[in-house]
Amino acid sequence: MKVYIETMGCAMNSRDSEHLLSELSKLDYKETSDPKMADLILINTCSVREKPERKLFSEIGQFAKIKKPNAKIGVCGCTASHMGADILKKAPSVSFVLGARNVSKISQVIHKEKAVEVAIDYDESAYAFEFFEKKAQIRSLLNISIGCDKKCAYCIVPHTRGKEISIPMDLILKEAEKLANNGTKELMLLGQNVNNYGVRFSSEHAKVDFSDLLDKLSEIPGIERIRFTSPHPLHMNDGFLERFAKNPKVCKSIHMPLQSGSSAVLKMMRRGYSKEWFLNRVERLKALVPEVGISTDIIVGFPNESDKDFEDTMEVLEKVRFDTLYSFIYSPRPFTEAGAWKERVPLEVSSSRLERLQNRHKEILEEKAKLEVGKTHVVLVENRREMDNQIVGFEGRSDTGKFIEVTCKEKRNPGELVKVEIISHSKGRLIAAIKGN
C-alpha cells in the first residue's frame, strides 16, 4: 500500500505529516512521490490565510481526476479542524477529515467513509504527546508545545490548534537523545508560541521555562545546533535574550514576527507590544549578538491600516534590515475578531504596499550580501551539489541562518560542520569556498 502526502503551510504541518507517515507505516503503507500510484492521498492543510484554503479544493479536484479508482482522499490539518464536515459537503470525493490535533487517529479513519475527527477540546491529561519513529536525518523537527493562548485579532490558529500545552521536559529530552543517537545534528524546536514554553503542562511537573529547556538540550551529546520557531516577541525579555546569546549550541538566528510597524495597527491586532517596544528588543538583541540573523512576518492591508501606518512598517524594515521576510496581504479568517470587521483596505492599495515592501527588502538583501564577502561562517552540510555526476560542492546554513552554496571538489557528508569563506554573491545568494583553500 502506498500513501502520498501533500503538505501545506508551516513547520508544524511538516512535523504532523511526518507523524501521519509514521502511523501509516505501522499499517505497511510506504510513501510515494507520485499521487497516481497512491492508495491513499492525504492533504495536510493550512488555514492561516484564505489562499491555501482555496487551493485545497482545487487540489482535491485534481487528485480526484488522477487517482487510482479505489484510492481514498483524506483532508487533514488546520482547515480540517475548522471546516470539518463542510469539506465533505463541498468535495464528495473526500473520504474523511482529520483535524490538526487528531493525527494519531489516522489508522482509525482510513477505513471509514465520510468520517470526521476534528475535536480540539479533549481532556488535557489524556493528551498523548506522540513522539514517533522518524527517518534518520541531519535536521529534525521536535515538538515542545502545541496550541496557542494568544488572542491576535487576525489569527485562526487558537481555534484550529486549541489551547496551549507544553510537553514535559523529560519527554522532550528523551526524544532529543533518541534523535541524536539516530544521527540528528540540528534540532528545530516547534510550537505556536515556542518561547512561552512551560506555561502549562498536561500534568504536574516542575516549573521550567524555555531557556531551561534550551540549556538542557544543549547538553545532549551529538546535538550540535538548536533552532526554534515560532516565538512571540512579548516573551523576549532580557533574561531570555542573555541566555540565548550565551548558549553556544543555540543558533544565532531568531524569528521575531513584527506583523506591523505601526503601534496603532499592533494595538488593533492585539499583539501586546508597540513599535518602540519591538525596536528596543531588537536593539538589545543586537547589543548581545551583533551578527544575529533576524527573520520576521509582516501583514499589509490590515483593516484601517493608513498610509502613515504603512510608512511606520517601512521605517522598521529600514532600521532592523531583516535577513528574511515573510510578507502577505491581510486575509480575513473565520473565528477571528478582525474577520468580522467591515473595514477593508482596497486590494490595489494592499498590493502596492506589498510590492514596495518586498522590493525594498530585496534591495536590503543585496546590500547585506555585498558586506558578507570575505567573512567566514561555519556551515552545517545539508546537501551535496553535483553536476554531470561530479561533486561541485554542497549547500547548508550558517549559525546565523544564512543559506550558503559552497564550491569545492572535496566530498563533504551531510551533517559535517565546515568553515567557509564568502567569495561572491548573486541576487541575495551567498557563494563560498572552504576556508583555507
From Swiss-Prot:
CDD domains: Radical_SAM (cd01335). Residues 1-115 form the MTTase N-terminal domain. It comes from the Bacteria. The keyword Nucleotide-binding does not apply. [4Fe-4S] cluster 1 binds at residues 10, 46, 78. GO terms for molecular function: 4 iron, 4 sulfur cluster binding; metal ion binding; N6-isopentenyladenosine methylthiotransferase activity. SUPFAM superfamilies: Radical SAM enzymes. Signal peptide: none annotated. It catalyses: N(6)-dimethylallyladenosine(37) in tRNA + (sulfur carrier)-SH + AH2 + 2 S-adenosyl-L-methionine = 2-methylsulfanyl-N(6)-dimethylallyladenosine(37) in tRNA + (sulfur carrier)-H + 5'-deoxyadenosine + L-methionine + A + S-adenosyl-L-homocysteine + 2 H(+). Residues 370-436 form the TRAM domain. GO terms for cellular component: cytosol. Its main location: cytoplasm. Its cofactor is [4Fe-4S] cluster. Binds 2 [4Fe-4S] clusters. One cluster is coordinated with 3 cysteines and an exchangeable S-adenosyl-L-methionine. It is found in: Cytoplasm. [4Fe-4S] cluster 2 binds at residues 148, 152, 155. Residues 134-367 form the Radical SAM core domain. Keywords: 4Fe-4S, Cytoplasm, Iron, Iron-sulfur, Metal-binding, S-adenosyl-L-methionine, Transferase, tRNA processing. SMART domains: Elp3. Pfam families: Radical_SAM, UPF0004. Its EC number is 2.8.4.3. Belongs to the methylthiotransferase family. MiaB subfamily. Catalyzes the methylthiolation of N6-(dimethylallyl)adenosine (i(6)A), leading to the formation of 2-methylthio-N6-(dimethylallyl)adenosine (ms(2)i(6)A) at position 37 in tRNAs that read codons beginning with uridine. PANTHER family: CDK5 REGULATORY SUBUNIT-ASSOCIATED PROTEIN 1, MITOCHONDRIAL TRNA METHYLTHIOTRANSFERASE CDK5RAP1. Monomer. This is tRNA-2-methylthio-N(6)-dimethylallyladenosine synthase. It comes from Helicobacter pylori (strain P12). The gene is miaB.
